[in-house]
Design a protein with these regions (language model features):
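Aromatic-enriched hydrophobic runs in primary sequence
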Residues: 6, 26, 65, 82, ...
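Basic, alpha-helical interaction scaffolds
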Residues: 31-66
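Extended repeat-based interaction scaffolds and adjacent low-complexity, acidic/S/T/P-biased segments
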Residues: 5, 70-71, 89-320
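AAA+ ATPase "lid" subdomain C-terminal helix
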Residues: 83-88
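Catalytic or ion-translocation cores adjacent to nucleophile or general acid/base/metal-coordination motifs
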Residues: 1-32, 103, 107, 111
Length: 320
């Protein structure tokens, strides 16, 4: 059993986590005011509500909404008035929501007019990622993943989506980062998704010279990595072991050829010859014409793209 970091969105009870709490970012700020800054309780509640309203108004204005400083003042007065009416020393989360609903929502609170409430919930939920204490039990695979993310400046401390553009044909560092992201996709940890770029498996986007990836951390990423920790201590080792197993289990030539392409994209060139021997067996035993055509197309694409990926001569596949 290994401990796993949680993000604020994952810890939000409103997101489906029954043991969580609503608005974790709101209460985190309140905790900091009370215990780290030593602020008086009533003053801490009031200041967190005020800061949240101002932040919500600022982000709404950035989106083109007509929210003024006067609206923010009215929302705060509404929240304080409701707190007094409810015999509270200071406004809290529910008074904050009621104040924003009263002052920020213009017109009917329909699906089209509830952008202030949606944004308020997003702010109160937060996007931070927790940390584990030192000396914790972290599998080597998770440690290597974190090390690679730091190397390529990929975010792990936030649950926000991060866009990454890689010039894979002109920059060796970008090719190495692309291989790491392809390894994360192969291990199915849910961290990265390629939105654009040349696709050797499907034969699309061959006129593109850049890859565009979307990366987003979640608690499920580390959970998946923990499950795959049995395959190796590094991303490359775990991907290689899983690739070797899937190649041994492949029953069709087209599946074997696609695995060969995936190994190429992940930079696992040291396995190329061993995999090509297995693919040769599949080509000789597969009697399905469409499968053979798909396998030949994958092998042809692989042969034609080696030079662009800086791998000319590294994937000759003598067995084929």
């Amino acid at each position: 059993v290994y401990p796993v970091r949680y993000s604020e969105p994952a810890a939000d009870a409103l997101s489906g986590y029954a043991s969580g709490m609503p608005a974790p970012a709101f209460y985190r700020k309140l905790w900091q005011r009370l215990h780290e800054e030593g602020t008086d309780a009533a003053e801490a509640w009031d200041s967190v509500v005020l800061d949240t309203m101002v932040r919500c108004g600022r982000r709404l204005r950035a989106k083109g909404e007509t929210i003024s400083a006067y609206d923010e003042r009215c929302a705060l007065q509404q929240a304080r008035g409701l707190a007094a009416l409810r015999s509270k020393e200071a406004p809290g989360l529910y008074e904050l929501q009621d104040g924003v609903l009263s002052a920020f929502v213009k017109g009917e609170a329909s699906l089209a007019g509830c952008e202030p409430l949606r944004l308020l919930r997003e702010i109160n939920t937060g996007n931070r990622v927790g940390e584990l204490c030192r000396g914790d039990l972290v599998p080597p695979l998770v440690q290597d993943f974190a090390r690679q993310c730091r190397k390529y400046r990929l975010r792990q401390d936030s649950a926000d989506r991060q866009e990454v553009t890689l010039e894979i044909f002109s920059k060796a560092r970008h090719r190495a980062e692309s291989r790491f992201l392809h390894q994360s996709v192969f291990l199915n940890c849910g961290y990265a998704k390629r939105d654009k770029g040349p696709d050797l498996l499907r034969g699309t986007g061959r006129n593109l010279i850049r890859e565009r990836w979307a990366c987003q951390w979640s608690a499920g990423v580390e959970t998946a990595l923990v499950e795959h920790a049995v395959w190796g201590s590094t991303m490359a080792e775990a991907s290689a072991q899983l690739l070797r197993r899937r190649m041994a289990e492949a029953a069709r030539a087209v599946d074997g050829a696609r695995l060969l392409v995936q190994g190429f994209l992940m930079g696992l060139g040291d396995m190329a010859d061993a995999m090509s021997h297995r693919l040769e067996e599949l080509l000789l035993t597969d009697g399905e014409f469409s499968s053979l055509c798909g396998a030949c197309a994958a092998i042809s694409a692989l042969d034609g793209w080696q030079e662009q990926y800086g791998e000319r001569g590294g994937y000759n596949y003598p067995a084929l």
